[in-house]
């Protein structure tokens, strides 16, 4: 069994990373599990623990989807939260425009139904997860820093491939290994 997911790798640029570091630094006393900079990606589909015999079929489907897809052009724009203002669960950066990435995510999820994987969610909201929140000690400070970083953005990004990753959970954080890359064909 391998814990796997498909994703697009993101290199958001130094200005975005500086804002991200400032946000993390300002919230360093909060129990937020931040994404490591070298692990920044946008998940297309999380498969979880998967029988290794399924990986060739998954790879074949991802290769076909990628071959029929064009490069993705978008920028990271704004910071938001999933959950409520009182119980935030995830800190994320938005995608602008979201439609091409949403279409790719929907296509991947629909194709993976054929391999026995359920859809992850009803409403697909393309986003870059920055951190996961267990609880907050200081909600006022948290909201102040989120509001102060609402304008965070990246330059235009051009994504030319999707990747099937293995996720190995370790005490110091997950380690991602690219199992296969699928270049976009259009």
Where do the language-model regions lie?
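Active-site loops and adjacent core secondary-structure elements that bind or stabilize anionic groups
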Residues: 162
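Helix-adjacent hinge/juxtasegments
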Residues: 70-104
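Basic, often amphipathic N-terminal segments
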Residues: 1-75, 100-153, 170-186
């Amino acid at each position: 069994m391998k814990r796997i997911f498909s994703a697009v790798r993101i290199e958001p640029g130094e200005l975005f990373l500086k804002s991200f570091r400032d946000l993390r630094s300002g919230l360093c006393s909060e129990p937020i599990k931040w994404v490591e900079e070298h692990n920044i990606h946008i998940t297309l589909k999380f498969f979880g623990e998967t029988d290794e015999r399924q990986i060739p079929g998954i790879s074949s489907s991802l290769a076909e989807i990628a071959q029929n897809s064009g490069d993705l052009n978008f920028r990271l724009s704004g910071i938001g939260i999933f959950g409520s203002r009182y119980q935030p669960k995830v800190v994320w950066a938005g995608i602008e425009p979201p439609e091409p990435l949403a279409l790719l995510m929907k296509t991947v999820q629909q194709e993976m139904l054929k391999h026995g994987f359920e859809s992850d969610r009803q409403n697909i909201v393309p986003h870059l997860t920055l951190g996961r929140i267990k609880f907050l000690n200081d909600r006022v400070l948290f909201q102040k820093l989120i509001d102060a970083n609402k304008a965070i953005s990246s330059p235009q990004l051009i994504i030319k491939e999707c990747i099937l990753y293995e996720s190995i959970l370790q005490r110091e954080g997950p380690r991602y290994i690219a199992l296969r890359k699928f270049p976009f064909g259009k």
